[in-house]
Amino acid sequence: MQKEIYYTFDINNIKDKEFTKVFVDCPWEAIRNPTPIDESEHLQWLKDSNLFDCDQDAENFFKDKTYIMSSYINPLNPKDNIIWVIRMHDFIYIVDDFYFEKGLLGEEWVINMFDRDAPQDKIGKTFWNIIEGMEKTGNKKAVEQLLHDTKIWALSVFTYNKCNINSESSFEYYCKYRCLDVGMDFGLSTAKVFAEPLPKEVLESSTYKRIIFGYNQTHSLINDMVSFERERKESNRMANYVMVHAYKTNSVQESMYHCKQMVEGVFNEINVLCEQLKREFPDVSNLDFHLNLIKLVISGDNYVSNDTTYPRYNLNH
């Protein structure tokens, strides 16, 4: 008998519905950026940002304390730069949550926003104000890469919405879309926006590309494990690998453990690949710095994602 293929998720189709949260063991220590966050100043920026319809919406968003995640995945950014990075991250959260997910902004708007010479609406003006702050406090080439990665993420939202992920999709097919949608190329770009970029030959090497692919895989799976409960309650869309694999095993719990094992396996692979890359490019002076930063971004994301007190991922806050 041919196996039924599901394009939406309904936990009633899964035999094992009960599950406990599973935590990923990360081999690298998470470090929070030491720069203290002036909460009242940041809240006022949110209110003045032209990104919300009213101050109450800004206050409600502020309660998510997204700046905590930003501080952990941007641990080394200097004091004058981190404020712009946090604003950039919040800009992305807000545009995604309040505009993209509600279908209020589309691909044409994204293309226009990234054209610096084009007339901008109030949202675009806020974006370019942040970029100017980045340019004043960061590395020019790194800011250009950040712009590229941010645009790729923004456009990927619409590509991801069109993909047909289902209960029989392979992990490779899922990653093709999800690794862009989760936006961690953007996250890594902000973490190193103040630093001299790696040479082109390193960035284009197969080993470095495998490291970045693994980096994106870990973030996708960690995000899926953390957001599974919220996503299944908010939408029946098959947008999470925990959902996909649960249909393969008929168990949410087994799917959670499977994702945990996959992430921890990728951690080991990244360690091996980093050592291999250092052997391939022994004379690149900033290679160690960049490889360490990749690990710090992963560990920071994992740490905050598994912090049950982090408001954005806490369903009860």
Curated annotation (Swiss-Prot):
Keyword hit for Metal-binding: yes
Listed EC numbers: 4.2.3.-
Short sequence motif DDxx(x)D/E motif: positions: 96-101
Organism superkingdom: Eukaryota
Coiled-coil segments: none
Annotated keywords: Lyase, Metal-binding
Membrane-spanning ranges: none
MF terms in GO: lyase activity; metal ion binding
Motif (NDxxSxxxD/E motif): 223-231
Xref: Pfam families: Terpene_syn_C_2
Protein's job: Terpene synthase that converts its substrate farnesyl diphosphate (FPP) into the sesquiterpene CAS 137235-51-9 as a major product. Is also able to convert FPP into 9-epi-(E)-caryophyllene, alpha-neoclovene, beta-neoclovene, and 3 yet unidentified sesquiterpenes.
Family: Belongs to the terpene synthase family.
Domain characteristics, as noted in the entry: Contains several highly conserved motifs that are important for catalytic activity including the aspartate-rich 'DDxx(x)D/E' motif and the 'NDxxSxxxD/E' motif, both of which are involved in complexing metal ions to coordinate the binding of the isoprenyl diphosphate substrate in the active site.
Name of the protein in question: Terpene synthase 3
Taxonomic lineage: Eukaryota, Amoebozoa, Evosea, Eumycetozoa, Dictyostelia
